[in-house]
């Protein structure tokens, strides 16, 4: 920038008046190149500072008070510092000795950040109809988040009066300390609840200190999630080109046996287990096949299924269908049961030897686990015996473990069909045999010996007494005792183990509370997906109601900017910001309609909006309701 030429147009009359005025070139550049060429202004800074400053009556002074209209009664005092209005004043150029006049420019006033009041959050006022300073909209779209409408629904002040999440200053007035003392709860007006946070409920608690947090305080427990995912994968598992046939409406057969050896000790026929899908309902079932069985009496299936379909018990695998087929190249009998993925038999879980440096037997089963098995099998036998039936198959290879210490009888009704009309024993005799098999099963679990290898039961009972309590030994001895000649009942047995039944029942209730706790936290995990679907039906929509740019105008344009704010963010280097937490937080706040302001900017940075989530929620509802009204039948779940 060239220095100002202050010598042009000067007169002698003006020279005398300008000699006491400090040259502006000296102030700006430190010197004046026209000092020796006739510049009439003062060039000595020391001289200017030593002389008293006389206010100029003719020249413009930056220290003069700002202009005040004549109608204003109060006169502002003169400021001693440089006024902010001087920044927008016209450049100083001396033109003569006359009285200068201020010239107005057509340029707009510069943006002054100091003139904007700083936003200070105030306390909520439930009695105020417009607590947020935003005009309420009447008509078809009432505001569900108005504090006046929530005041009647919320409890009175002092009840549940907890500070808002993330508000460390509680409910105090502006200027309160950032971390106030927590001696008592605040007594001001209550805050609205967090509808965008889904708080789990239930009495489930873990032994943690108040300042401690576990991972599943924020997510589903990792082991539970992995277990559910593995079971889902196992349910959907298929084997291409397996060579297994399709059985009428059963398809996609997958073998579940871990051994390919044929075993006829339990049913008298080799049996195999498959997973199959039912084409009628799409569900998966477990099919148990008896190889080489030839049905001689059709009433066997009808009568047995009529009796066993009535059995509904949590410790028994439900049977659904029995049929014969020749698709395997022979005459086979098929039983369809409920499918429990990743389940193992008690024989696979407890009787498999451990192979290491030396061959050693499996470890002993804890007594609490054995008592849990006893309570569940007793529960199953009570239901079976109450319906004048017998379990008949209490083998470790036919009882499955579906979860931790959770067992089910999986081969019921098979012997009733296979031996239909051939068995001369009564139901009471078969029920008494169930008690003996029950006792051998528990004794084999306690001693680590399969029931078929229990040749010396008294010696096994002595071994049991050395490792476990006297109550367990007494219960097993009662089940195995056949010398008394009395008719045993499952009710009598359950009376003797009432203490253990109560303990197991309490553990089951605690487990149910824990599952309910995690379920309550996941009950609304699909709400963000539904909100996103509704948002996408509004954005980028083509011609609507004769308006080609409907989605680019009005409220829809601001929703489009909100979409960019949530999903198209970049960091300081211009790289995509893929923070899932940011996306979930923004969509949750939009769903809740909170009063938090955000800055929305267009992609060309020409348009800027400062909007709250509550205003965006109103725009979001109006736009979607407009689409719903225009549709013929409406949108299913539009009001969810």
From Swiss-Prot:
Zn finger limits (C3H1-type): 17-46
InterPro entries (UniProt xref)? Kinase-like_dom_sf, PAN3, Pan3_PK, Prot_kinase_dom, Znf_CCCH
**What UniProt keywords apply to this chain's record, in alphabetical order?**
ATP-binding, Coiled coil, Cytoplasm, Metal-binding, mRNA processing, Nucleotide-binding, Zinc, Zinc-finger
A Pfam family cross-referenced in the UniProt record is: Pan3_PK
Subcellular localization, per the record? Cytoplasm
Predominant location: cytoplasm
Span list, region Disordered: 43-101
Instruction: State where composition is biased (Polar residues).
Output: 43-53, 63-87
GO biological process assignments? mRNA processing; nuclear-transcribed mRNA poly(A) tail shortening
Q: Where is this region: Knob domain?
A: 538-640
Q: Which residues form a coiled coil?
A: 499-537
* Residues the entry annotates as binding ATP: 263, 288, 338-345, 397-398
Q: Where is this region: Pseudokinase domain?
A: 237-498
One cellular component term (GO) for this entry is: PAN complex
The record's Gene3D superfamilies line, in alphabetical order, gives: 1.10.287.3700, 1.20.5.5160, 6.10.250.3160, Transferase(Phosphotransferase) domain 1
Q: What are the recorded GO MF terms, alphabetically?
A: ATP binding; poly(A) binding; protein kinase activity; zinc ion binding
The text the record gives for the protein's domains is: The N-terminal zinc finger binds to poly(A) RNA. Contains a pseudokinase domain. The protein kinase domain is predicted to be catalytically inactive because some of the residues important for catalytic activity are substituted and it lacks the equivalent of the binding site for a peptide substrate. However, it has retained an ATP-binding site and ATP-binding is required for mRNA degradation, stimulating the activity of the PAN2 nuclease in vitro.
Provide the assembly information: Homodimer. Forms a heterotrimer with a catalytic subunit PAN2 to form the poly(A)-nuclease (PAN) deadenylation complex. Interacts (via PAM-2 motif) with poly(A)-binding protein PAB1 (via PABC domain), conferring substrate specificity of the enzyme complex.
The record ties this protein, via PANTHER family, to: DEADENYLATION COMPLEX SUBUNIT PAN3, PAN2-PAN3 DEADENYLATION COMPLEX SUBUNIT PAN3
Task: Provide the function of this protein.
Answer: Regulatory subunit of the poly(A)-nuclease (PAN) deadenylation complex, one of two cytoplasmic mRNA deadenylases involved in mRNA turnover. PAN specifically shortens poly(A) tails of RNA and the activity is stimulated by poly(A)-binding protein PAB1. PAN deadenylation is followed by rapid degradation of the shortened mRNA tails by the CCR4-NOT complex. Deadenylated mRNAs are then degraded by two alternative mechanisms, namely exosome-mediated 3'-5' exonucleolytic degradation, or deadenylation-dependent mRNA decaping and subsequent 5'-3' exonucleolytic degradation by XRN1.
Q: Which family does it belong to?
A: Belongs to the protein kinase superfamily. PAN3 family.
Protein name per the record:
PAN2-PAN3 deadenylation complex subunit PAN3
Specify the taxonomic lineage.
Eukaryota, Fungi, Dikarya, Ascomycota, Pezizomycotina
């Amino acid at each position: 920038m060239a220095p100002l030429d202050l010598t042009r147009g000067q007169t002698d009359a003006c020279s005398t008046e300008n000699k006491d005025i400090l040259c502006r070139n000296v102030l700006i550049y430190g010197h004046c190149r026209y000092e020796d060429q006739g510049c009439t202004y003062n060039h000595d800074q020391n001289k200017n500072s030593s002389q008293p400053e006389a206010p100029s009556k003719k020249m413009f002074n930056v220290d003069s008070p700002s202009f005040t209209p004549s109608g204003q009664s109060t006169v502002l005092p003169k400021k001693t510092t440089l006024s902010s209005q001087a920044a927008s004043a016209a450049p100083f150029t001396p033109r003569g000795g006359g009285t200068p006049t201020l010239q107005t420019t057509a340029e707009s006033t510069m943006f002054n950040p100091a003139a904007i009041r700083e936003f200070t959050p105030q306390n909520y006022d439930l009695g105020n109809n417009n607590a947020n300073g935003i005009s309420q909209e009447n008509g078809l779209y009432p505001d569900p988040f108005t504090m006046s409408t929530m005041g009647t629904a919320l409890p009175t002040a002092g009840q549940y009066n907890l500070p808002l999440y993330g508000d460390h200053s509680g409910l105090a007035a502006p200027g309160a300390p950032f971390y106030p003392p927590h001696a008592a709860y605040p007594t001001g007006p209550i805050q609205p609840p967090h509808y965008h946070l889904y708080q789990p409920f239930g009495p489930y608690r873990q032994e943690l200190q108040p300042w401690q947090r576990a991972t599943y305080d924020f997510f589903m427990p990792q082991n539970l999630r992995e277990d559910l995912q593995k079971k889902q994968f196992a349910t959907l598992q298929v084997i291409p080109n397996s060579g297994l046939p399709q059985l009428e409406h059963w398809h996609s057969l997958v073998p579940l046996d871990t051994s390919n050896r044929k075993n006829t000790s339990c049913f008298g026929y080799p049996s195999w287990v498959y997973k199959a899908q039912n084409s009628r309902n799409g569900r998966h079932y477990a099919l148990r096949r008896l190889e080489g069985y030839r049905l001689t009496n059709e009433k066997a299936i009808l009568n047995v299924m009529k009796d066993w379909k009535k059995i509904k018990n949590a410790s028994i695998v439900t049977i659904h269908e029995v049929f014969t087929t020749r698709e395997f190249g022979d005459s086979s009998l098929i039983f369809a049961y409920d499918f429990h993925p990743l389940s193992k038999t008690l024989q696979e879980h407890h009787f498999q030897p451990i192979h290491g440096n030396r061959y050693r037997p499996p470890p002993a089963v804890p007594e609490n686990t054995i008592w849990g098995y006893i309570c569940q099998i007793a529960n199953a036998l009570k239901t079976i015996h109450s319906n004048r039936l017998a379990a008949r198959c209490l083998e470790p290879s036919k009882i499955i473990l579906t979860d931790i210490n959770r067992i089910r009888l999986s081969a019921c009704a098979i012997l009733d069909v296979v031996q239909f009309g051939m068995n001369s024993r009564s139901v009471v005799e078969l029920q008494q045999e169930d008690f003996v098999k029950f006792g051998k099963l528990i004794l084999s679990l306690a001693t680590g010996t399969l029931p078929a290898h229990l040749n010396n039961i008294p010696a096994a009972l002595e071994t049991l007494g050395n490792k476990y309590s006297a109550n367990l030994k007494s219960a097993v001895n009662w089940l195995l005792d056949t010398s008394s000649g009395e008719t045993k009942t499952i009710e009598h047995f359950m009376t003797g183990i009432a203490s253990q039944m109560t303990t197991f029942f309490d553990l089951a209730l605690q487990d149910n509370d824990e599952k309910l706790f995690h379920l309550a936290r996941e009950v609304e995990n699909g709400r963000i997906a539904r909100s996103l679907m509704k948002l996408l039906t509004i954005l980028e929509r083509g011609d609507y109601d004769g308006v080609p740019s409907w989605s680019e105008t009005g409220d829809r344009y601001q929703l489009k900017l909100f979409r960019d704010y949530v999903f198209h963010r970049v960091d300081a280097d211009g790289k995509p910001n893929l923070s899932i937490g940011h996306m979930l937080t923004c969509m949750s706040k939009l769903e809740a309609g909170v009063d938090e302001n955000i800055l929305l900017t267009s992609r060309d940075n020409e348009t800027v909006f400062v909007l709250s989530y509550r205003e965006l929620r109103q725009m979001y509802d109006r736009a979607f309701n407009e689409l719903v009204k225009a549709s013929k039948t409406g949108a299913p779940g539009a009001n969810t």
